[in-house]
């Protein structure tokens, strides 16, 4: 059994950022300061193994920024795997975290919890992209379980007063073998890859270009938050290639980040 940890805190004082990081194998941080700081979250094991229990915590202070990247897809190996991620974003902070796709292999039992707390003036771009299995090997829907829970709290009230957290978004997927209903038209149909891009907080309104994979339009749906406390958009996309979904999400976020920098002339 492996207990991996990856903790990262960034605070900003004027033009300078203070970064505190800690990692415990097999999780590793690899990065350097910049504008914004860019860190890779690495796992030299080539994926998550049965018995793994990983904890990821990211905290950004007021005005701080961070971009997190991965080096490739995350493969889920046979056995029970647990992972918890906690994110806390202070006013006017910005986090971009678009991981590569997650690939659940035969016999994998993956259970994930993602908890996010953000100020309405912060900006979060976060994605989850999944496949039905090791598609290149002809393996589909052979994993035991894929359970992922996402909860987002928004700080409500005046910053000078005692602020309370409002549960703003809650989503949960729980797919279990033999996955009898996943391929129905109301769920995924014939598609073997799917993903969600969450753009929460003070982003410019996004533009979603039409995506074609192998000459076929990749279906997508856009959900806009009606909540006046915190704005947000969620893009759902399905298709035959998880890498294409990941690239599309990354392009959208890059365009938004560039527009944000232009409008604010830097943080």
UniProtKB/Swiss-Prot annotation:
Decide whether keyword Chaperone is in the record. yes
Tell me the protein's name.
Urease accessory protein UreD 2
Question: Where, per UniProt, does this protein localize?
Answer: Cytoplasm
- Source taxon at top rank: Bacteria
Q: What does this protein do?
A: Required for maturation of urease via the functional incorporation of the urease nickel metallocenter.
Organism, as annotated: Synechococcus sp. (strain JA-3-3Ab) (Cyanobacteria bacterium Yellowstone A-Prime)
- Entry keyword set: Chaperone, Cytoplasm, Nickel insertion
Against InterPro entries, the record matches this protein to: UreD (IPR002669)
Chief site of localization = cytoplasm
Q: Name one Pfam family in it.
A: UreD
Family indicated by similarity: Belongs to the UreD family.
Subunit comment: UreD, UreF and UreG form a complex that acts as a GTP-hydrolysis-dependent molecular chaperone, activating the urease apoprotein by helping to assemble the nickel containing metallocenter of UreC. The UreE protein probably delivers the nickel.
Instruction: Supply one GO molecular-function term.
Output: nickel cation binding
Q: Name one GO cellular component term.
A: cytoplasm
């Amino acid at each position: 059994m492996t207990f991996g940890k990856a903790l990262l805190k960034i605070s900003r004082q004027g033009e300078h950022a203070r970064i505190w990081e800690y990692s415990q194998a097999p999780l590793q941080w690899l990065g350097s300061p910049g504008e914004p700081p860019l860190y890779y979250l690495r796992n030299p094991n080539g994926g998550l193994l049965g018995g793994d229990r990983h904890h990821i915590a990211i905290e950004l202070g007021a005005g701080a920024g961070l971009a997190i990247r991965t080096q490739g897809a995350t493969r889920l190996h046979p056995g029970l795997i647990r992972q918890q991620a906690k994110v806390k974003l202070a006013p006017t902070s910005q986090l971009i975290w678009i991981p590569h796709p997650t690939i659940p292999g035969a016999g994998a039992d993956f259970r994930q919890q993602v908890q996010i707390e953000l100020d309405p003036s912060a900006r979060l771009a976060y994605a989850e992209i999944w496949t039905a299995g090791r598609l290149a090997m002809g393996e589909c829907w052979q994993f035991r379980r894929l359970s992922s829970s996402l909860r987002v709290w928004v700080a409500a009230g005046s910053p000078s007063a005692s602020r309370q957290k409002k549960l703003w978004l809650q989503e949960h997927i729980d797919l279990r073998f033999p996955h009898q209903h996943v391929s129905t038209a109301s769920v995924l149909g014939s598609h073997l890859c799917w993903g969600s891009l969450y753009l929460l907080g003070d982003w410019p309104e996004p533009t979603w270009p039409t995506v074609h994979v192998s000459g076929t339009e990749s279906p997508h749906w856009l959900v806009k938050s009606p909540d006046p406390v915190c704005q947000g958009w969620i893009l759902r996309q399905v298709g035959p290639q998880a890498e294409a979904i990941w690239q599309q999400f990354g392009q959208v976020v890059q365009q938004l980040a560039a527009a944000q920098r232009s409008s604010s002339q830097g943080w």
